[in-house]
């Protein structure tokens, strides 16, 4: 079972609807319980998400497979961000993965084998692919300048674009759009996003002129661009640790 499998296993039955995942509607009892819990619990981790970014991503083993992604960002400090990734920003989104974002300084401290798993962000910002929905460019400029110098590691755990009604198989490593043939986002996908938010990616390029990427771009990031090799996850059986942790 690998993240590059076209079909990792038996798919849930498809009924021709767009409902993901399959299941019965919430009962009134469940709705009341959810509302009560929301009033009484702090939900502190969720409330730390303070920024919404929308961009695109390519599968690490097949850059021709591209998806729109919505990142909800929690900034732990100036050098580290953690993001919940959804396939849309509607009231019924699907949580499809997580991305960690680190500063150039932290990225350079990583082992080269670890660096292979990370991607840069400067191209998607400079070309207007990454946007801050409903936030004016002038307001977002400083944030975009900061993110352009960072690196990200994005694991996709639910391939809804493939039609999976449930999260199936191994997680897939995702990569950012790049200025190479397979890394350029398909026009139809771009138009759909722009129409949804009433923006023009092409016109954003002008306002992004002068935004710079990392001081020294590391070639271990965006590994598929520089080395022509994709990366996939495989799941194998292994012997379990049979010694008890306590006497």
Swiss-Prot record:
<comment type="similarity">
    <text>Belongs to the OBAP family.</text>
</comment>
<dbReference type="InterPro" id="IPR010686">
    <property type="entry name" value="OBAP-like"/>
</dbReference>
<dbReference type="Pfam" id="PF06884">
    <property type="entry name" value="DUF1264"/>
</dbReference>
<feature type="region of interest" description="Disordered">
    <location>
        <begin position="1"/>
        <end position="26"/>
    </location>
</feature>
<protein>
    <recommendedName>
        <fullName>Oil body-associated protein 2A</fullName>
    </recommendedName>
</protein>
């Amino acid at each position: 079972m690998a993240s590059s499998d076209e079909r990792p296993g038996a798919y849930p039955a498809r009924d021709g609807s767009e409902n993901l995942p399959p299941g019965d509607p919430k009962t009134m009892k469940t709705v009341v319980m959810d509302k009560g819990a929301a009033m009484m619990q702090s939900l502190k981790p969720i409330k730390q998400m303070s920024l919404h970014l929308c961009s695109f991503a390519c599968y690490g083993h097949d850059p021709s497979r591209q998806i729109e992604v919505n990142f909800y960002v929690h900034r732990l400090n100036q050098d580290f961000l953690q993001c919940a990734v959804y396939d849309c920003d509607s009231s019924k989104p699907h949580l499809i993965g997580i991305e960690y974002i680190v500063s150039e300084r932290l990225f350079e401290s990583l082992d080269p084998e670890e660096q292979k798993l990370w991607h840069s962000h400067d191209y998607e910002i400079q070309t207007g692919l990454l946007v801050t929905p409903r936030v004016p460019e002038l307001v977002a400029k400083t944030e975009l300048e900061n993110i352009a110098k960072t690196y990200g590691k994005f694991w996709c755990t639910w391939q809804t674009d493939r039609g999976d009604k449930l999260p199936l198989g191994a997680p897939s490593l995702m990569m950012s759009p790049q200025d190479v043939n397979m890394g350029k986002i398909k026009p139809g996908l771009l138009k759909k996003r722009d129409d949804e938010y009433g923006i023009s990616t092409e016109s954003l390029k002008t306002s992004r002129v002068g935004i710079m990427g990392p001081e020294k771009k590391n070639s271990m990031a965006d590994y598929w661009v520089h080395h022509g090799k994709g990366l996939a996850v495989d799941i194998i059986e292994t012997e379990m640790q049979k010694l008890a942790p306590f006497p």
